[in-house]
Structures are given as C-alpha cells and as structure tokens.
Amino acid sequence: MPEHDPHQENRTVSSVRLEDDAAEASLRPQSLAEFIGQRASRENLSIFIQAAKARGEAMDHVLLHGPPGLGKTTLAQIVSRELGVGFRATSGPVIQRAGDLAAILTNLQPRDVLFIDEIHRLQPAIEEVLYPAMEDFQLDLIIGEGPAARSVRIDLAPFTLVAATTRAGLLATPLRDRFGIPLRLIFYTASELELIVSRGAEKLGFDLSREGAAEIARRSRGTPRIAGRLLRRVRDFAMVQGVSPVDRSTADAALQRLEVDSLGLDAMDRRYLHRIAVHHAGGPVGVETLAAALAEARDTLEDVIEPYLIQEGLILRTSRGRMLGEAGWRHLGLVPPPSAAGGQPDMLTLLHRDGSADE
C-alpha cells in the first residue's frame, strides 16, 4: 500500500483504507464460507487449513498480494479464526528495529497467526531477522556491542506468517521464496460485488433493491472496500431523503452527486485520463511526468489509480510510458488523433516488448 497521501482522503473511490472505513469491520465476512469471490484462493486456503489442523501443525506461511481493498486483511483474520489460533497484526513501517520484531515473535503461542501488512516496506536488516524465524522457527540476535558482543539463538513457537503487499515485486527474493503459499487476489466481478453489496445492506439494516445493489456494484471498481464505502454513502442519501426501498435511480442519483461515473471513475481518474488525452495526444507519457503534472506521488498513481484503469483497458502500460486505450478515448467522449487511431500495430508492439516504463 502506498504511503499516506492527503490527496486520497477525499476520494470516495480510493482503494486505500480511509478513517471512514472503520465501519467496514461490521461488513466483513467471518469465515471462508461467508467470503465472496477469490474462488481459487479461497478453495486452496480451505484445503491448506484443513490439512494443517489434521496434522496439528502450524500452517505454511502465506503471502497475499494484489491491489488494495480486495480482502487481504480479512483473509488473514479468517485464516486464524478457521485454524482456531491467536491472531497478532502489525505492519512493515511500524517495525523499526529488530528488537521490535523479536518481541512480537517471542510472544506468539504455538501455531498462532502473525499478520504483517505492507511487508514490502520492512527494512532489509529486519528481513534478515525474519529469515531464520520463518524457516527454522529460531531467532539469531546479537547481544551487546564491540568485543563483548555475542550471538544468541532463541527458539520460537511454530507460527504462521500471513503477509500482505500491493507490491510483490519489491520483496527480496529470499523473503518471497520463504512463503509456501503465495496467493494473488484479483479484482471482483460485478456479480460478486452485487452479492457483497446486498449482504452489506442487510447488515446495515436498510432495504436495497437488486437493481440498486447492481448499480452500486457496477461502480465499485472491482473492489469490495469501495463497494462498502459507496453503499454507506447511498444509505446516507436515502435516509435523509426518506427513500425506501433504495432502487437503481436513487443509487444512481447519490453516486452522481459523489461524482462517481458509470465506470466507477471519479474526478481524479478523469483528470488522469484527460491529461494523457489532451496534453500528450494519447501518449506514450512517463509516469513521473504524469505524477508531477497531477501533483500526486508516483506510488499513488501506480498502486491506487492505474490498476483499475489498466484492468478496464482505459490505459495501456508500455515500455515507453502510459498510453490512452480505445476505451479511454470513448469514456472521455473524445476522438483519438489520426496518429493514435492508425497506430494500433505500434501500440501492440510496445506492449509485447520486454520491460516496463520507468518514467
């Protein structure tokens, strides 16, 4: 997950966790049976959990990676609940010293689950401490300084590390290789999100029609966290206006007032697309150039804004930079310039080149 960015605080469709999302805990599934979507990952986890319980051993370490808001933290909590063991949570940026990690690890009970969010932001020196802990359930610590320093090995209770990251490529290879169960979470389908929205409406205690749920799901960018946030905002509008049940037109009106369009894009997304279309003739343009022009951090563009735009074909990520896709031109209601319209073979060539745009 990218570092805190104040520009994201007012984005209703931001996939990063906001203060308002504290209410989402009440909407979270409590078991794998309740969990909607991520079918392959969910079914595999169920098998690994059952096998670990049958053997009476700690489950192998799990790496959950994918865009923010897809349920990594929720799945980690479900794993501990299904295993019937304790759950400890922390995050990469919080662990500043090897001693911090040692204190957490030595306090774990046998087979407990330790969840580390944003594990790609762990300092290299702390990663080194984690290697023997994951592989041999032992800690190697240096006690003292100078000539009096000595190495001490501490045995740990067997535990399961469940780690989450939005940037799996930033993990050091030795760390990544120590996860026996790597699972990639993908964007949710509209039908899966419709089920999530309908269930959320029941838990929040308001009447939402199937068409209303479908409208919210369609604009949720394939992300349950955004679906829950839009659901709560639609509920607010409906409550103040005294509308019940909430149908498609009510949901549409509320989302239009939030400036969330039919694809789930907000003003920030449209600024991004408009910048490429108008100022760069559809691209290619480097991400650093876009970040400077939009006054956003590069990480914010790559982790929060771009994944869904790429998924929907609105932009293309090539070795020379970002290009506006045909769907992007259509969504903006603009006609692509002749160079873009006639340059499709070149765009495909760019896409198949090795490497990615650094700028």
Curated annotation (Swiss-Prot):
Protein name: Holliday junction branch migration complex subunit RuvB
Known catalytic reactions: ATP + H2O = ADP + phosphate + H(+)
Family the entry assigns: Belongs to the RuvB family.
Annotated GO CC locations: cytoplasm; Holliday junction resolvase complex
Region annotated Disordered, chain positions: 1-20
Domain of life: Bacteria
Assembly and binders: Homohexamer. Forms an RuvA(8)-RuvB(12)-Holliday junction (HJ) complex. HJ DNA is sandwiched between 2 RuvA tetramers; dsDNA enters through RuvA and exits via RuvB. An RuvB hexamer assembles on each DNA strand where it exits the tetramer. Each RuvB hexamer is contacted by two RuvA subunits (via domain III) on 2 adjacent RuvB subunits; this complex drives branch migration. In the full resolvosome a probable DNA-RuvA(4)-RuvB(12)-RuvC(2) complex forms which resolves the HJ.
Region Small ATPAse domain (RuvB-S): start-end pairs: 189-259
Region: Large ATPase domain (RuvB-L), residue numbers: 4-188
Region (Head domain (RuvB-H)): 262-359
Enzyme superclass (EC): hydrolase
Compartment(s) where it occurs, according to its Swiss-Prot or TrEMBL record: Cytoplasm
Function field: The RuvA-RuvB-RuvC complex processes Holliday junction (HJ) DNA during genetic recombination and DNA repair, while the RuvA-RuvB complex plays an important role in the rescue of blocked DNA replication forks via replication fork reversal (RFR). RuvA specifically binds to HJ cruciform DNA, conferring on it an open structure. The RuvB hexamer acts as an ATP-dependent pump, pulling dsDNA into and through the RuvAB complex. RuvB forms 2 homohexamers on either side of HJ DNA bound by 1 or 2 RuvA tetramers; 4 subunits per hexamer contact DNA at a time.
